[in-house]
Amino acid sequence: MEAKAKLSMIRISPRKMRLVADTIRNKAVSVAVATLKNLNKDAAEPILKLLNSAVANAVNNNGMEADKLYVKTIFVNEGPTLKRFRPRAHGRAYEIFKRTSHVVIVVSDEK
């Protein structure tokens, strides 16, 4: 069986989120949690919370055992971009993109 969790509108760019997501793909949940706790990236914290949510969904809604779960799928999509302007010299302005991410994680107990 599978259990899913989604996280939307995270104010971290998708490129940075994918670096963290790639480190835990196809790993056991216990290994993934240990990896995320020791990873020195800002994106690790929201992904860790999302992984814990997916495990809780698997245990509470589907009756799966937490120690048999692994990260079957994790992907990061680009969310809406906030556009801001930075004043520059001679009346110019540079556009600043504040990117957001959507993350979906699926845990499963069967390989």
From Swiss-Prot:
PROSITE patterns: RIBOSOMAL_L22. It comes from the Bacteria. One of its GO terms (biological process) is translation. Disulfide bonds: none annotated. One of its GO terms (molecular function) is rRNA binding. Keywords: Ribonucleoprotein, Ribosomal protein, RNA-binding, rRNA-binding. Gene3D superfamilies: Ribosomal protein L22/L17. It holds the Pfam family Ribosomal_L22. One of its GO terms (cellular component) is cytosolic large ribosomal subunit. This protein binds specifically to 23S rRNA; its binding is stimulated by other ribosomal proteins, e.g. L4, L17, and L20. It is important during the early stages of 50S assembly. It makes multiple contacts with different domains of the 23S rRNA in the assembled 50S subunit and ribosome. Belongs to the universal ribosomal protein uL22 family. Part of the 50S ribosomal subunit. This is Large ribosomal subunit protein uL22. It comes from Mycoplasma capricolum subsp. capricolum (strain California kid / ATCC 27343 / NCTC 10154).
